[in-house]
Amino acid sequence: MDTGEEPPLEGLNVFDASQGVAGPSCAFLLAQYGANVIKVEPPRGDWVRQAGKKYGDLAAGYVNFNRGKRALCINFKTKGGLAIGKRLVSQSDIVIESFRPGVMGRFGLDYETVKKTNPKVIYCSISGFGTKGPNRDKPVTDVVAQSFTGWMTLNKGNDGIPHKVGMTAMDVITGLYAYQAVATALYRRAVKGSGKLIEMNMMQAAAAFMGQKIIEHVKQEGKITVLGAPTGTFPTNDGSINLSAREPDKFHALCQLIEKPELEHDPRFNEWDKRIANVDELTAIISEATITKSNAYWTKELDKLDIINSPTATFDDFLYHPQTKAADYINWVNHESLGNIPMATIPGHSPFADGILAHAPHLGEHSEQILSEYGYSLKEIEDFLKTGSVVQYGET
């Protein structure tokens, strides 16, 4: 599907010096909406290239969060490499970095220095703990953010121990908030003509994302919040199903379906607040009924009653469901290194089949091309390659 619309961020130049997931995911969204994003990496590459199973110099995480970018590999520790970095940031609309506080300053690439030659730059600096406080210089990964902010207490296992959510949730959330902040700063610049420093950190993003739970924790003294009953996951004879029958009419319908009409009049369950107070007993009774039949049966019958429900799906269930295909949740792309892979459609964005928006670059894949675009001669580029200031993919 292609709407033929002009990408809204076309013409914007982005210097993406970030690594990992948070910064790259922000830059990834800018690229998907048409910005010219240059992925700037040191000779060793973004560390996420090595995270998980590797496909040459690529890994699934790198591919997912760096689609649509071009790659430039430069060594800031060389005179030539640093000069290249300074030239590019002076001509960039947006700069994104995710080093610990002070690192970019040591190279003269911090906001205060950059804005002297590029006053309209939007500079997004992403860190773990922020630029203040006793933890400002501590290294952070997603699991640290999940642990420090209390997020893991929302995911206790049967052992009662808080566990990490099995993906880089805090990183992705930080990237989304960073993209939001950059987008509003772009509008501000269009209206007022001024640049902006955006200081983003993972703990702040996590707190914002969990805002409701944090308020509930304080007001309810740590007690678990039950929004209504019956809701949640119930066992079936071939898996489990999730349903919500909180409203009185839905509870009535569910009681009839599981052939337990007496529950409606049971003094433990005949009012909203009573169902919440006795949620464990109610859940156990409903589970005794749901475990006798299959997911397919319950889905069909609950749908008839317009009761919110969904079987607990695997990734394969989701990927190959007819709804997933019909609504373009996923694009299947033939990647040159990974083969046929599923790529999630950006919400609100037109699906794509292949091309630059689906391509995640190899380390230094576009180095020579980018340097040429920024005014460097062939002789200068050759010298950069010889001195190790620049690395071009495919050249030794």
For the regions a language model picked out, list residue spans one by one.
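Short linear loop/turn motifs
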Residues: 265-277, 313-320, 380-396
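Glycine-rich beta-alpha junction loops
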Residues: 44, 128-130, 202-207, 238-240, ...
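A short glycine-threonine-serine/GTX helix/turn-capping micro-motif
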Residues: 163-173, 197, 225-231, 240-242, ...
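Substrate-binding/catalytic subdomain of NAD(P)-dependent oxidoreductase enzymes
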Residues: 185-218
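N-terminal helix-loop segment corresponding to the beta1-alpha1 unit
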Residues: 1-191, 217-218, 362, 368-396
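Aromatic-enriched alpha-helical interface/lid elements that frame and gate functional surfaces
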Residues: 87, 230-305, 309
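A glycine-rich dinucleotide-binding beta-alpha-beta segment and adjacent secondary-structure elements
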Residues: 304-357
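C-terminal active-site "lid" helix and adjoining low-complexity regulatory extension at the edge
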Residues: 341-379
